[in-house]
């Protein structure tokens, strides 16, 4: 059908759903403050057309490591912005542009895997060279990248967009390291069976839906069951996803009439539901209304898949002796292992940069970001702080927050503008303000659209209370955001 056909189909479905509510698409967009559907179409605005018409004459060999959403979108925008682009992408996965935000919908039985998996070759911009290989070593001192196949690739400018890896092996009892686009055989030995699930890769999302149906079936026998949901002690992509799948489980259990038979419990490593107070407060109220339980400061460290027991490291502070210097009591960090039974557990794995990045001089050398091996870039310009011809964006970039597709939509414009400025010998003036968006699915038919930046304040794009669950955001999530991403962002226009 093609991308435009996919978009038309999505908008037709959107119209049908809106008609059930007695409103038109135009009225819905007006309500949401969108004005028109042009933002979905990926249409080139007059300003963008002018930019393309006056494309930069700057020259240089650009190497992009990573052919996912961030890498290909950046390649497309650079191709549109340079008169004679010389761009190469290194990417080993033939399905690297899978629509990751849809994995929660697959896990909730709303979509199928076929709705989120795409062929990378269909999105490579014209004129861009694609190398099907994996970066093994970065040599920024000599402007080279060495692949696993032994090829040495030189560059004038490097963009690191490798994404991150899912390190299930950091949890005792689980095995393997994978990506959102693919999971190795080690991971599948333990995940996706015996009640242990994870939506963070495509097949895992499929198996989660199967596991959820099995949970419902068992609950219908009258048994009292326990479902656990985790959030690790590392930065993760889409911080709302561990809660989204919990909300969807709640919705499906209610739909089946067996919600009272299953206790749903969330065990995050952190001490809040969300880093933005307004969204934290809203989520707490939603949890209370749904009788979903939670306990902070719990990090999953081990699973026994045979006995269905999860072991958490629980942390807290205890008051010690009085310190006369600070005129307060000393607070002593405490911890202990806590074992919890489960019938169903959703595991959000620890995440980190790929080994090639983590073990290179591109990674942060000190501070909290060094633990995960994230690329050391200026959080505003996305330029490497030590290697000025290197940039990074997306999940692998060592910036606060920013591990969502919505972040990439802001980041890649900043990166392209700054890279071209560098190529032209100009000052880097474009700044990324930390924008992140999380369409937090709270049920079948409701979404809270959480937008924010480094101020940790809501930054809504629309004139509506962002802490309220709305049907219009469900329509946006289910029918509109995918075509905007696939047709708009991946073409460098959204």
PLM feature segments, named:
Residues 21-37, 42-59, 131-244, 248, ...:
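FAD-binding core/adjacent interface of flavoenzyme oxidoreductases
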Residues 396-426, 430:
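A conserved FAD-binding loop/helix module that cradles the flavin
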Residues 175-221, 338, 342-407:
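FAD-site-proximal beta/loop scaffold in flavoenzymes
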Residues 449-494:
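C-terminal auxiliary extensions adjacent to catalytic cores
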Residues 1-24:
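N-terminal secretory signal peptides
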Residues 43-83, 88:
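C-terminal segment of N-terminal export signals and the immediately downstream linker at the start
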Residues 82-155, 277-293:
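N-terminal Rossmann-like dinucleotide/flavin-binding domain of flavoprotein oxidoreductases
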